[in-house]
Design a protein with these regions (language model features):
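Short helix/strand-capping connector loops at secondary-structure junctions
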Residues: 130-149
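Disorder-to-helix initiation segments
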Residues: 1-20, 135
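C-terminal or internal capping secondary-structure element at the end of a domain, subdomain, or sheet
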Residues: 144-174
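Short, low-complexity, charged/polar segments at coil/turn and helix-coil boundaries
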Residues: 13-132, 163, 169-174
Length: 174
């Protein structure tokens, strides 16, 4: 999944400053490759009837537990993408584009059981296999959709950035 590209942040800042139309076009191209993966990941989210019984909304819940429940519609709408660069991690790497789940229940469904695998009481009943290469790069919906995409999204985002760089260099050399 991770791919190393250098100079992309400087390119995007320069495009935003000198060629804003090219920056918008690049963002649209990147989004076109991320949207199918996002749509496919939403399809892997189980309905309210398929999820474990303790996760559904309780009518008599009060306090902090009043807002902590699983709702399939909320989880599906929480899966989205962004094309803006992330903050650097402790090793200095950034994500130029990412697909993530905003909802807490969706994030738990995605990542539960990464360490324990199928040995815990909680994660085997969630259903869905953990897909991905490494322990930190596994999940049930987003990572499964990304794995089935077979790198088309990554290649498309890189191609969009490279074509934007070529267009930007051609426009600024005049």
């Amino acid at each position: 999944m991770p791919t190393r590209l250098q100079g992309v942040l400087a390119l995007r800042k320069a495009m935003k400053k000198f060629e804003p139309d090219l920056a918008k076009e690049t963002t649209k191209e990147m989004a076109a490759f991320l949207k199918p993966v996002t749509r496919q990941a939403r399809g892997y989210i189980p309905s309210n009837a398929e999820i474990m019984s303790g996760w559904l909304k309780r009518p008599n819940a009060q306090g902090r537990w009043a807002n902590r429940y699983y709702d399939a519609a909320q989880v599906k709408s929480g899966i989205s993408y962004k094309t803006s660069p992330s903050k650097p991690n402790r090793r200095g790497f950034r994500a130029l584009a990412s697909i993530f789940n905003k909802s807490a229940a969706g994030a738990i469904y995605e990542t539960a059981g990464r360490k324990s695998g199928l040995t815990g009481n909680f994660s085997p009943r969630l259903g869905g296999q953990l897909k991905g290469d490494k322990q930190k790069m596994t999940g049930r919906a987003i990572f499964r959709a990304f794995e089935e995409d077979q790198g088309k999204a990554t290649a498309g985002v890189i191609k969009a950035i490279e074509s934007a760089a070529a267009k930007f260099n051609a426009r600024t050399k005049k």
